[in-house]
Every structure is written in C-alpha cells, then in structure tokens.
Amino acid sequence: MAQKETSSKSRRWLGLSGAAVLVANLVLTGTTIAFQQEGEVNHALGIEGAGASYGGTEFSADGTLSDASYEKYIEAAYQFCEQEEEEGSVLLYNRNNALPLSESERNVTVFGRGSIDPVFRSTAGGSSTNPDYQKTPVDALQDAGFNVNQTVLDAYASAEAPKERSVSSVGEYDPALFTDSVTDSFASYGDVAFVTLSRFATEGNDLAMVNDEGKRMLELDDNEKAIFQKIKDSGKFKKTVVLLNSVFAMEMDWLDEYNVDAVLWVGNPGFYGMPGAIRVVTGEVNPSGHTTATFAANSLSAPSAENFGLHAYNYGSKTPRAAGDSFVSYNEGIYVGYRYYETRYEDTILGQGNADSAVGTKASTDGWNYAEEVCFPFGYGLSYTNYEYSLDKLDYNSDTDTFTATVTVSNTGDRDGKATVELYGQSPYTDYDKQNNVEKSSIQLLGYDKIDVAAGASETVTVDVPGYFLASYDAKGAKGYILDAGDYYFAVGNGAHEALNNVLAAKCGDAVAGKLIDQDGNVVTGNTAAVATWTAPNTEVDTQKYRNSRYNSDVEVTNTFDDADVNYWANDDEKITYLSRSAWDTTYPTTLETLTVNDKLYNGLNMQTYVKAADAKSVSDFNLGVELDEKINFSDMIGVAFDDPKWNDFLSQLTLSDLLINMGDSKGIKAVKAVNKPGCTIVDGPEGMNGQFKYGDRRNCTGWATLPIVGATWNHDVQTRFGEMYGEDALYASIPIAYAPGADTLRSPYSGRTSEYFSEDGVLSYYAAKAVSHGMRNKGLIGTVKHFFLNEQEAGRQGISTFANEQAIREIYMRAFEGSLAEGDSLGVMTAYNRIGVMYAAANQGIQHILRDEWNYGGYIIDDALTASEYSSAPEMLMAGNNIFCLDTARPNEIEKLITSTDDGDLLQKVIDSNHYLYYVMLQSSMGGSGAEDVVVSDAAPWWQTTLRALDVVFCALAVAAVVMYVLHTYTDVFSEEKRKNRAAKKN
C-alpha cells in the first residue's frame, strides 16, 4: 500500500512539473515577445519617454494637442475619409445616365456579401476599426435617406454562413437565400438593385489566379452570376448598380449580359469612407476619380501573368541555399499594365511588329483586338458632365529641363465638376532602339492636375513635367539614359487610351482614319487639339544629356543592376528574350518554369559572405564614449544641418553599446540616456496606423480609404492632404515614424498587397508617394516608403530571386519611389524581403548606390522584418547601407560581437554613419519639436518589464521546484522498491 501511495505522489509531481515547465515557457515566451515589441507596448501603456510625452504641438492644425483639439481633429479625419471616396471613386460605366439617382429613387435592395460585410482594407499591419463609426454600403445608404429592403437584409442575417472569404474564395452567400417570400419583396424596393462585389487579399497571400472553383478569382463566381441572373429574371428593378469593392481590377465584360446600368469603383474604402461614395451615387458629388490600373476582359491577359508566382530552382545534386528555392522573372520588361495594352494597340493599328497575331490573346476572337482585351483603360473615369480639352501651348525650359503644358478645360455640361488633366507623352521608337533592345511604350503618363470647372465655364491649368521622363534607359548600348532624335508628342485625354488616339490622329492623320477605336470598339477620330509636338534638338541619339544624375551631378548614371537580369546567371539554353514591340509574336513571354543552379548562380545565392577587409581600420582609431567639456544632448541638435561638424562631437559621446541601441527596432527605438534621447514608437502601415490615440476617447487610429483610392483622386492636393491627415493622426497618437506609404508597382492585378500601393504606373506612384510623404513631413511624421523594390508579389517573398532588366527597373519599379526619396521629403525607406537578382535587397550594394549616390537620399534605410532569417547577413546588410534592423534586436548584438572580436573598424564606421542618419531623421520628426528639451531619460526600466522579469523568476522557480520534487519522489520510489526487494529476498 505504501508503494502505491508513493508512486501516486511521483505521478502527481510529474504532472505538476510538466505543467509548471509549460507555464514557465509560456511566460518566458510572452516576455520575449513583449520585449521585442517594446515600442508598441510602451505606446499602448502611455509610458513616459516612450514617445508619449514629447511635444511637437507646432505641427498640429490647432497648434496644440489636447482632448478638445482631438475632438475637432477626429471629426475632420472622418470627413476626409469620405472626401477620399468622393474624389477617388471611379464611375466606370453609366448607361443612359443611370446615375446620379433622382430624389425619387430611394427604395432599394442590396445584394452581395459586400453590401453588409465589405472589404474595408487588407489585414496587413495597420489600423483596427472603431465599430461604432465604421460604415458599410448599407449603413451609408440608410444614412443618405435610402429605404433599404429589410426583408433581404433579414434573409442575409439568417442565412447559413458563407464560405470564408479568402484569396481563393469569394465567400459569397448561397443564392438559395432568395426564397419566393424574399423575392416577393423586390417590387416594393425596385428603384435600384445595388450589387456589391468584393475581392480580398493581403500581406503574405496573393490573390489566387485560379480559385477553389477552378475559375479566375477576378471573374464572376457562380454565386455572383446567380445574383445578377436573379435580378434580371425578376423584372422588378428599374436599375442595377454595381459597387466595385475591390482594389483588384476585376473582369467586367459581363455588364451587357446582365443589363447592368452603372458601375462605381469604390476600392477598399477604409472603415469610414463609404458615405463619400454614396454621395457620388446621389449626385451630391460629381465623380472625378480615374482608374490607376487597366481593367482587362481577362485578368490573365497581361504578359506578366506568364511569370507570376513561384518558379523553382533546379539545384540538381547541390544543397539548396537558405530561402533560395524560388525565383520570378519579369520577362515582359517595360510592358506593364497599360504600357502593354496601349503599345500593342498602336502597333495593331499601324500594322507593326505582328501585333495583331493571336499570340498572347486571352479574350479576342480573331487575332489581338484592343476592344475585346480591355474593358476600362488606365486613367479612365466618367463624370456627370462633359469636358473638352485643348493643349494650347508647350514650353521647354532648358535651364531646368522642364516642359510646361498649358491646357484649357471646358465644361460643356450643366453640372459643376472637377476635371482631371492627364498629360501623356510618346517618344520615337527608332532603329537605334531596336538594335540596342531599348523598348518604348506608345504612351506614358508624364504628369497630371485636377481643377474645378463650373458648368459652361473654361479653366486653364499648367502641368510641369521633368524632361528626364522622356528619356529611355539603354542598358546595352549607352549603358545610361538616352534621348532619341525625332518628334515627341504630348497629349491630354480621359485616360491613356484616349490620349494615344489623340496622338495617332495628330501623327498619322488620314492614315488612321476609321481605324481608331475606343475600349468599346466604337470608331473615334481623336482630338488633335489636345496634342502638342516637341522636336528634340539633337539629330542623332543623345547619350550624354542625362549621363549624370539630376540629383547629384557628380555621379554618373550607368548600369547598376546587370546582375538582376536572369540572363546574367542562366545557362545558354535557359536564357530568355524580353518582350519587344518589334516582334510581338515571337517575343511574347512564356513561363520560365525552372532555372538550373549552375556554379555561378549557386555562389551568388550565398548571403553569408562577409569578410573583414584587409585594410579595415581598427576600433582604436575611433573616439567613443568621449566626455565633452559641455555635453551635447539630443535636443541640442535640433536645427543642426546634416553635414555640420557638430555631429562628430555629438556622436563621439556614445559608446559602442549606445550606438547599437538605435539600430535594433522593437516596434520602436529605445531611449539613449547618454544624450537624453527619448524612446519612440514606430508603427505600420499604409492603410492607417496600428496604434491608439493618446487623447479624447483613446480610440484606434484612423483606417483611411486605401492607397489605390488616394491614387485614383489624381489630385496632388488631396494626396498631400492624405499625408497631412495621416501625420495629424500620428501627432495625436504620439508616433514620430511610420512604415508608410507603400509604393510598389502593381505588376499584376493579383498582387496581394494591392491595397497598400497606388498604381500599375510608376509615374503616378512617383507623384502620389511624393505628395503623401510631403504631407507627412508637414506634420512632423517621418514616412518610411516601402518596399524598395521589385516586391510585386507575396508568393515566396522571403528570399525569392526577382529578375528584371535594367530598363524596367529604372523606368517602372524604381521610379515609383523616386518622387518621394529623391524629389520629395521622405526620410525613410524600407527595403524588401526579396532578392534583387540573387542578392537580398537589404544587402544589395546597388540599392545603396542608387539611394545615397544617384538620388542623394539623406534619410534612414531599414530592412523588412526578417528577424534573423538565414538568407540575410547582418554585416552584409550594414555594409550595404542598412541603418536599422526591423523588429530585430538580436542583429545589433551580433554586430557588436563581430566588431569587438575582429577589431573591425569598417563595421564600426557603418554603425556610426547609421546613427548619424537615425538621429538626424528623428530630429526632423515631432521628436525634434517643441518640448524636446524638456525630456529627461531615466535608467529605470518600464514597470511592465520589471513585472514580467519578476514573473519569469517566480514561474521558473516554481518549475524548478516542481521538477526537484518529482525527482526526489522518483528517487524515493526507486529506493523504496529496492528496500522491498531486499526484504523479500531475505524472507526467501
């Protein structure tokens, strides 16, 4: 009996010790995570010195930060969310002027999950909703005075839950919910059938090209088709209006089939923007938004679709490199989005390059046909009035290399409106270009503006354009930018397609009469009054005009990314030919399914290559931890220019440990007591900040209408205002730095993070990101533009090799960032997870050269959140210009050990340089505003850290005690059993 009792105690202690160890591990893990997110935890708890107490009130609209001023601000913020939708919603289709609705058309029925459960934003890092204030389409309709069919709403509420909405499932309700009793209600609410169509994807997950039903995710799914068929068959609705709640350009070739009357693209409206879109429906607001992407009849018709997603390396007998399994190759070159559709259209009209062949067709019935391939062009949008455009004058200032187009817009309708002036250009496509693989888009955006034009009135506006935008990058011949000889055409129009038709009419005259068509296939004549011509002064190709950087004349612009081209690495039998308009049929991309990892490629994929330079300085060559006669604090550096020698004295006060504090991001940067620098919080994201306000009701920060909407406003003022409102949000949340905006190019309509980027066009993103960043700086917020660059898909994003040619890199993908980083006010840039070619972006010396040398960029550089992933190398990243490690406090420790163990002065110099950038940037934010001199940094750890450490000790001690008790009882059991056996043996 005693033995059984003892064994029972042992088993109990075994269970208790196991539970205690598990709990201790959970507590330790929680502590680790909390410390990694220190900035966010401090921010949430309002810890003094963690970004919650420094001033910056001079940046606020009211000149103060208080509960009272917050109440005024938050009202203005939500009003601006609605304004984003008012100016960014795009009227794509309006048969027989179905919109705006009359005041008598107020009895309506809503259809589609998106009407009651829309996609407000992606689920990437960013703002959370404030449920009491968010607005669905139904909410916005009811607020606007519409009588919404309650029977249908009740049917949705009681219906079986639909399939989860995901990147591979639309998640629409089963149309079986429309029973006879439900459809009987249609007659009383038959003024309008509103159908909301939604698509969802997010960080880490691209939209599936083929969904769970085996269909393209951007075509109508069966349940959606059933909804439209139900509406059509009922015969009860006077109008059918579609609200397109998708940032992904959906296939829209079915409108006639279902008798749709109007389509309003509302994108992802954020949590509070939908009322603005409904004001467009009612006519309270005249629509003025224009598309930022091409809406194709078949969403896989772009040449990029042939090489999107994951393609596997073939390592053969070699051991695969860490995070080196996959690649993607941009074989389409510069022909992204409208550059493909419009260029192929011109060549089809002019009979060039076999453009009318069937190769690459997805929707055409007999050879490539623009009207069958495209539903709505890039830059297109309708209004409730009509505008006529004339390009009155084109001036060129050679001193500033700037073109100025003077454009008159006449409102010939009976409604006041906002007219978007889109200026496009066409460069000559020459024999030199063909011989040197220089590609030319038939039309490219150059600039834009937006103006109010009263009914019956005319307004004149000027649009300035850098002459540099007309240059083309020649990676083969000149190895730099070139300006071809010949005529350059400038044109305005309602989108790229209309502008191109205007150019063709001016350039070709009678030769194209009867051949030009709009997206519906209607013959058009083109407007030659909307075109101006400039003849380049050079009689042969000019390879010198843009030889040196326009931002830093001491730096020559030449090939930097030869090794980003797949042909640099591929075996001869796997080399590719980039798409060329000289031969559409033979160069149209095919899928590069695999790539053999030869020795050259295998060595290139190895990221762990850092070796201390033979001539590296010694750590002893540097003065660290110097005690100056008069201490220089953080606040003493306010207003000190970046190149002022005072920075040397300031930085010399810091020890190596002090220097490394700034370089480890824990959703913020810790305080540095040595110079009395406070800690700060850093937050995501492009759709709104994942933080809470520190004033008023302490609600979540604002979830704005997302960046495709901001782009679709085509309004510099609204885009700047977006940055300012975002920055004001940050002031009331005590946040000086944010990871926003996003500026990657929408190479494919299936890109998972479309909601965080502006456009398929690098020039539109150039201007929009520049304006947003400027607005943020106006409010003391450092925007961190991301993800630099070639980060156009989520599949395999950590470690994927992204291959592209240098012309596409410079004219498309880097240009989207150039406005904010080289021209604008951004002092932050985040590199991408992917490799540029085979080199991880944050360790790519070419990126540092572009940013620091060519663009003369003076801000900080941060990697994306790798957290010690194997394919990255901390010293390689540091030497390539990375200044701070995102969500990673381990890397600075690694750097410290490497510097001290190897006496590596080169690494130390990079650490000092990084701190120079980081301190300078922080001082340009609200951290360097009023009240900075009053901050006192304490050695004391925040109370929550002390508490967690105490809990760690307690639970670890309990776990150890439980294990000890288990061991003791187990030993006692064994000892007792031995004694029992000995007694039994003696009896025998």
Named regions from a protein language model:
Residues 1-474, 482-492, 496, 545-988:
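Glycoside hydrolase catalytic-domain context in secreted enzymes
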Residues 467-542:
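Terminal connector regions
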